Amino acid sequence: MANLNQPPSRVTPNLLHILNAFTDSSNTIINTIVELNSNTINKYELITETGHLKLDRVGYSSLAYPFAYGCIPRTWDEDGDPLDVEIVSVTEPLIHGSIVEARIIGVMKFDDGGEVDDKVIAVLSDDKRMNHISSYEDLGEHWLKETKYYWEHYKDLKKPGTCNVNGFLG
């Protein structure tokens, strides 16, 4: 039987604080801690103090994430959280809490109810099907529209009109 009220016998390292943000000297490949997969409405978030994943919320509508999502260790955005990463064109589900190497292809400027909450756009660095993608623009016009639509409407049932995509950089 487990001793539920006993302190842990060892400390689990917090990946947010020990992993480097970049895996290479060219600063194009990032470590990304996976928080969720595409086609889910559940929003998981890393607890910054411990590095554990927590169900932050269940989506307010059936509008599911159109990409896998995670964060970059040792980074902090203006909203006080690690920098967010959209991992696009993932064909197989990733394991929540796992570390993947991703190649940066752009940034989406995002205003979430008055807070800056920009999103790094990336592809899995080892996915040979993505070798031809060097910029978010290579994903096509429909991808841009879908991503913009998702971010500008995912909170509509809770706080309509509070989220704005302010462009893409690449």
Where are these regions (language model features)?
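Hydrophobic N-terminal alpha-helices or hydrophobic patches in metabolic proteins across all domains
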Residues: M1-G170
